Amino acid sequence: VSSLAHIRGRPIIDRGQVFAISHGGMMVSIDLRSGRRIWGKEIGGLSNPWIAGDYIFLLTNDSEVAAISKKSGSIHWVQSLPKFEDPKTKDYPIIWNGPILASDRLIVSSSLGQVLSLSPYDGKILSSLEMSSGISVPPVIAGKTVYFLADNASLVAYR
């Protein structure tokens, strides 16, 4: 882990493996007991990854949601998200938060207030909705409810 710079998301421990991602462009899997690096992948991100089954789901620095194999670090799929509010001029970058997994859907939210649900199996966008305000923090799941804290201090819950 010492070779990783700019770690913003918390490392995740799952079944004897530690997974860490840096904003600087590296994700690694490390054996928890020995400290030996199992694999490394040139991919960067700011948010905490989400682990489910054999995959790690994450947001990349390039506004992509990706599914990566826990075992090998190979990329299973990648889904691009909008990067700019105005794609022609590349003004006003969009900041994405998440992902979280809820009821067979990956959920991400944006600084513009857009919420997307994606298939964890192939990354296809399944649905989209617009909040009344931007969202600057990742959504939270508790029980069967997903909570979003919007920038206008609204707390929105979906089941």
Residue ranges and their predicted role:
Residues 1-13, 36-53, 78-100, 126-143:
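Extracytoplasmic beta-rich repeat domains
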Residues 1-26, 31:
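Solenoidal tandem-repeat scaffolds enriched in leucines and small polar residues
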Residues 28, 66, 116-117, 156:
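WD40 beta-propeller blade core
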Residues 31-34, 69-72, 119-123, 159:
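Short loop/turn segments that connect beta-strands within beta-propeller blades
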Residues 110, 120-159:
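Hydrophilic extracytoplasmic domains
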